Amino acid sequence: MSKPNNQNQQNNQEPAPEDANELIAQLQAKLDDIVASGKQPYPNTFKRTDYAQDLQAAFEGISKQEIADNDAKGEKTQVNVAGRVMLNRGAFIVIQDMTGRIQLYVARKELDEKTLADIKSLDLGDIVGVSGYIGRSGKGDLYVHIEEIELLTKALRPMPNKFHGLADVEARYRNRHLDLMTNETTRDTFMVRSQVISGIRKFMLNERFMEVETPMMHPIPGGAVARPFVTHHNALDMPLYLRIAPELYLKRLVVGGFEKVFEINRSFRNEGVSTRHNPEFTMIEFYQAYADYHDLMDLTERLFNELATDILGTTEITYQEEAISLKAPFIRLSMSDAIAKYAENFDMNRINDREYLAEYASTTLKQQVKDVFGVGKLQTIIFEETAEHQLRQPTFITEYPAETSPLARRSDDNPEITDRFELFVGGRELANGFSELNDPEDQAERFLGQVAEKDAGDDEAMHFDAEYIEALSYGLPPTAGEGIGIDRLVMLLTDSASIRDVILFPHMRRKLEG
């Protein structure tokens, strides 16, 4: 490959700060020249009719000779394309639009000197509109034979290294516009994310669920065990909380008669940031009357199967070099059975012995144990520390303790456990669902238990929500509900190691100046 000149920024290395400043000055000078010539530097009159990917697909299998024969018969395929200049080699230019890349062919003998000069002055990152007709090179590459070309936007900063994009991961997150511009993998990831969300919506609508919107700011945080973000409403002079989950509002809609509802939106939790957690995240929550948690496990299997098949073409995927099958049925395992399988040197005969559980959690697992923790809380800690990370294939863990499931219905067979499940894939939780607690007296007692934990210092415990108890008293039909983390699902389907790779603008620590 020939090495372009400096003025077109095509250097194999990232420019040093002084070089970058020089390039910025050169780009600004070019813009000044355009303005001085009387041209509109940012015109908005070009109308695109064609996309790169569509043209590549339309001419797949059509040879160079066939295209030339059509040209000779006066049957040229006229197109109007637009995009960002990614390569300018004089005879050929490569532009990129939202669907992909396509070449532009510069026929020097057919273009006037002014047009050739304009083409020569193009820099990487400039945005152009091109009218011309389709051709194919001797190497088989499809191109647009330029008849007219117009500069639509002049780039005033040099692009990142065109061969390696943004090498620094943090720089990619902070400058997602540059990452998308130069990194095909990043663009593909967010195209899949869009397909996942639209696919979920299509699936739910086909299942006769109704899409709804509920408040993002709550007077009382609820619907999950988590620490909320707090704000203040000046006009009402009251604290408000960014929602940690939409659950309680959605169940009030079921009380009102909307028997199958779902919402896709953000929730917020004022907790740690990691490869699995972002303070602002996207989830779907849905509720179905006259269903139980078994029905939702079946629905979840169908949903995951359909998404993988429609988007990836298969249910057999690879995540971080590990083969995972999303084909139904998924593994189903109770929490106690998971502890028996994965907790080393654990005496299952003492699974309900609080003293033994506390000793195992604190001594063997090195976990902090508080006096307020009951048997169910300790069982959950032991499960999370010993089993969770080992659940590689899709696995529904069922029969969670009532103590750690304040909104879930108690099991008819054992009131100490609930009709609840969580779905784990690749050692990570992707979904949480249960048959809903619709007994208002039991719900009030569980809220009081959460209040006791909060008073004992648990910042993540729930508040007592009297309005929800009142709504529940009007009668919630037998109902099952579930939440699925869309960010983690996209991580799985795109083989992304970090949640930051699948969120366009993840939260970052403020960049220090200087």
Curated annotation (Swiss-Prot):
SUPFAM superfamilies associated with the record: Class II aaRS and biotin synthetases, Nucleic acid-binding proteins
Annotated GO CC locations: cytosol
Keywords: Aminoacyl-tRNA synthetase, ATP-binding, Cytoplasm, Ligase, Magnesium, Metal-binding, Nucleotide-binding, Protein biosynthesis
Known cofactor(s): Mg(2+)
GO terms classed as biological process: lysyl-tRNA aminoacylation
Subcellular location: Cytoplasm
GO molecular function, one term: tRNA binding
Cofactor note (record): Binds 3 Mg(2+) ions per subunit.
Keyword Aminoacyl-tRNA synthetase assigned: yes
EC class of the enzyme, as a word: ligase
Keyword Ligase: yes
Positions that bind Mg(2+) 1: 422, 429
Binding site for Mg(2+) 2: 429
Low complexity: bias regions: 1-13
InterPro entries attached to this UniProt entry: Aa-tRNA-synt_II, aa-tRNA-synth_II, aa-tRNA-synth_II/BPL/LPL, Lys-tRNA-ligase_II, Lys-tRNA-ligase_II_N, Lys-tRNA-synth_II_C, NA-bd_OB-fold, NA-bd_OB_tRNA
Enzyme Commission number: 6.1.1.6
Entry superkingdom: Bacteria
Main location: cytoplasm
Family: Belongs to the class-II aminoacyl-tRNA synthetase family.
Subunit structure: Homodimer.
Protein name: Lysine--tRNA ligase
Taxonomic lineage: Bacteria, Pseudomonadati, Pseudomonadota, Gammaproteobacteria, Moraxellales
